[in-house]
Amino acid sequence: MSKEIENKYLIINDGYVAMSISSHHIRQGYLSRDPDRTVRVRIYDDKGYLTVKGRNSGDIRLEFEYEVPITDAEEMLALCPPPVIDKTRYIVPFGGFTWEVDIFEHPVKMETAEIELPASDTVYELPPFVGQNVTGDPHYYNSNLGE
């Protein structure tokens, strides 16, 4: 069992671009958007993943992720009801942590940054490109985009 502890913020400027060490293209869809158990199919550059997530409890939830053959991921993505999400992810090291900045192109235009933490009470510094904390707000869950 794996627990995901993360915080999500809105982006207020493009300072993340100069600070990033890499960027990646991501396409993802949801076989299940049930809040108790989301099932996501993701193509991350040229690799496929299947992820099952439990219900959000603030900043903590169960997460199980498995690499799958890219051809399987493409076929599963075709089974996902619309919308399929298209985004670019920037990897940004800051303050001893790795921030993931997602720039969504489809189905909505949006920019968010996430940080995964070892514990809910972990103290961390905010990078200069983040604004409002939207952790736990269902409007910003990837599984709810475009609905």
Where are these regions (language model features)?
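Phosphate-end processing signature that detects enzymes handling 5′-triphosphorylated RNA
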Residues: 1-147
